[in-house]
Every structure is written in C-alpha cells, then in structure tokens.
Amino acid sequence: MAKNRFNQHWLHDHINDPYVKMAQREGYRARAAYKLKEIDEQDKLIRPGQVIVDLGATPGSWSQYARNKLAQGKKRDAEREGGIDGTIVALDILPMEPIADVHFLQGDFREDDVLHQLEEVLEGRAVDLVISDMAPNLSGVASADAARIEHLCDLALEFAQNHLKPDGALLVKCFHGSGYSQIVEKFKQQFKVVAPRKPKASRDKSSETFILGRQLKHPR
C-alpha cells in the first residue's frame, strides 16, 4: 500500500510539474532539457561552431536543447528545417530515437569500437563541451550509491581529459552525499575553474546537483 501511495503521489507531481508541461509543449523528450537550458543561460556554454559530446544521452533532451541552440535561425521548429552551426555527438548504451543533425553512437564510450566511431565523426577535432546527465540506478544504500555516482563522474572526467580542448568545459550530474566532496576535489585537480550548479528545474526534494569544470589544467 505504501508503495502504491508513493507511486500515486509521484505521478500526481509529475503530471502537474510545470517543466513536464513545458517539455510536452515545446517538444522536448524530458524535463531535463530545462536544467541544461538554465545552466547554459547562466554560463554561456553552448556557442555556434562548437563540437559537443553528450554522454548518457538517452532519451535525448540535452541533445535536443544543444541542437536547437546551434540550429540555423532562431525558430523553435528549426529541427524540421535542418542544419546546425556545429557538431553534436550523443552516446549511450541504450537506444535513442533519432534527432535531426545529431550523431548518435550506441555503445559504451570506453570501448575501442565506439571510440573509433567517435573519432570518425570528429575528424580529428577536439571537443569544446562535454555534457553528462548520466545517473546510476540508485539502490538506497548510501555507500553503494555514492560509489556508483562517483564512478560515472570519473568516467566523464576521463573522457573529458582525453577529448576536450584546453579551454573546453565539462558539465556532469551528481548528487549531494558522502562522495560529493571527493568528486568536487577531482574536478579541481583537472580544471582551473570549478562551480556547482543547482538549476530550478531540479526537483526540490532531489539531492541532484551539477558540477561545471572549465579550462583543463593538464590538456593532452
């Protein structure tokens, strides 16, 4: 019974969520698009001509937002017109419905085959921005969840170190908890500028937050 009440409460909140309604109205696949939008508007992350990589992209709302930002013209229906000023590569182990002008690679970005496909798309170009909305399946066991979250952040950090331009940026999702300070410290070891971000689109009850790193200390 308690589980049913929780599910009913979540469904009620979800249906009445203004960001869910906005996403449905504006054609985004998830309300998460507005988290990236708010951070982008604050930090001016996405600019014309950039190479952007979206890790853990499915269902694709972050790639949609980035695509719309780089689209020719300023119309919300630009996706139907085609053409962007820049390159977006979305990666996920899960399938994703196509998005116009977005290169989607399904697979683990640590594997050589996927990295080879990525290199073919990039054509030798370094990446301006890596965005990651990856999140593990949380178990409710604090220590185990902290380790899973930190692991995903480590993967994003390693990817960024290998692919970012010296003045590039990495934005990742994490959660406040026992491992949060360690993640921030790892960012500080890798980036000259590190800042936490908590967009209004994040649910009030969620411990979700985002960390932004800019300008690699030790570019490759």
UniProtKB/Swiss-Prot annotation:
Entry EC number(s): 2.1.1.166
Region span, Disordered: 198-220
Keywords from the named record: Cytoplasm, Methyltransferase, rRNA processing, S-adenosyl-L-methionine, Transferase
Location of the protein in the cell: Cytoplasm
Gene Ontology MF terms in the entry: rRNA (uridine-2'-O-)-methyltransferase activity
Keyword S-adenosyl-L-methionine belongs to the record: yes
Family: Belongs to the class I-like SAM-binding methyltransferase superfamily. RNA methyltransferase RlmE family.
Name the UniProt record assigns to this protein: Ribosomal RNA large subunit methyltransferase E
Active site, UniProt feature: 173
Location (main, coarse): cytoplasm
